[in-house]
């Protein structure tokens, strides 16, 4: 006995309603009006003044002229990736995974002019694609931005005090460069010892270096200080240095 298969086949349902149309991203710029007492306030409304400041400082043009990235991402431009990371740091996020909390926030997406942020894996691939020369280019970008901020704020410090110190970053696992060295909170564990420099007068971060867990030597300290001095604005003429006993060596004094 032959059965007609068409009688026992379930018909496919026809989609109802109009097809979904993708909405255009919001466009928020320096000329966008804002209010601090209106309704429907976003918790990240403070990003608008930050984005306005970066726009007036020429951050986009500076990124396009300074950074050389051979792998061009598709989700967003290089400037949009860097701006998203910078704004996330202003919000208080310390990990790229935290960007998922603001992936569809109208303020952040409006500043970036995108519909929504790409997933975390896209940000990680973008960061992994950056070559080592990009790190020096970012320092150049930071130096130019500091110079422009000082000129806009009319800050003219001819004499400054530079604070230099190391910190301990405990490692969990077998990361490259980890050493068992000075680690008072987690004795015996591997760690890194980054060097950080701050400007005492303005509390600005001037420069830093991610190092292994060994104690820095005299030549390393001198080379690091030379790079920090080069990042200072041109108006600085006299520099006073403050550091603990671990940095006291003849190479550092000569630098």
Language-model regions: role of each:
Residues 176-179, 250-255:
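A short alpha/beta connector and helix-capping loop motif
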Residues 224-228, 242, 252:
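Short, hydrophobic/aromatic alpha-helical segments in well-folded domains
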Residues 1-215, 219-234:
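Dynamic "connector" segments at or just before major functional cores
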Residues 165, 238-248:
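Acidic/histidine-rich, metal-coordinating catalytic segments
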Residues 233, 245, 249-252:
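Internal, well-ordered domain-core segments that constitute the primary functional module
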């Amino acid at each position: 006995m032959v059965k007609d298969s068409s009688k026992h086949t379930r018909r496919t349902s026809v989609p109802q309603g109009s097809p979904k149309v993708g909405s255009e991203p919001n466009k928020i710029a320096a000329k966008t009006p804002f209010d601090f007492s209106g309704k429907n306030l976003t918790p990240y409304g403070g990003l608008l003044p930050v984005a306005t400041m970066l726009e007036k400082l020429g951050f986009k043009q500076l990124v396009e002229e300074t950074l050389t990235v051979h792998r061009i991402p598709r989700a967003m431009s290089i400037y949009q990736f860097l701006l998203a990371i910078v704004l996330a740091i202003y919000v208080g996020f310390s990990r790229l995974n935290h960007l998922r909390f603001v992936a569809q926030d109208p303020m952040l997406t409006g500043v970036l002019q995108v519909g929504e942020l790409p997933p975390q894996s896209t940000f990680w691939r973008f960061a992994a694609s950056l070559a080592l020369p990009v790190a020096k280019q970012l320092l150049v970008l930071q130096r130019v931005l500091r110079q422009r901020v000082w000129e806009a704020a009319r800050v003219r410090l001819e004499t400054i005090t530079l604070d230099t110190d190391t910190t301990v970053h405990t490692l969990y696992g077998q990361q490259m460069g980890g050493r068992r060295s000075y680690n008072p909170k987690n004795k015996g564990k591997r760690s890194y010892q980054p060097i950080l420099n701050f400007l005492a007068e303005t509390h600005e971060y001037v420069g830093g270096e991610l190092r292994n867990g060994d104690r820095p030597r005299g030549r390393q300290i001198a080379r690091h200080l030379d790079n920090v001095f080069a990042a200072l604005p041109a108006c600085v003429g006299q520099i006073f240095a403050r550091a603990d006993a671990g940095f006291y060596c003849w190479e550092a004094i000569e630098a």
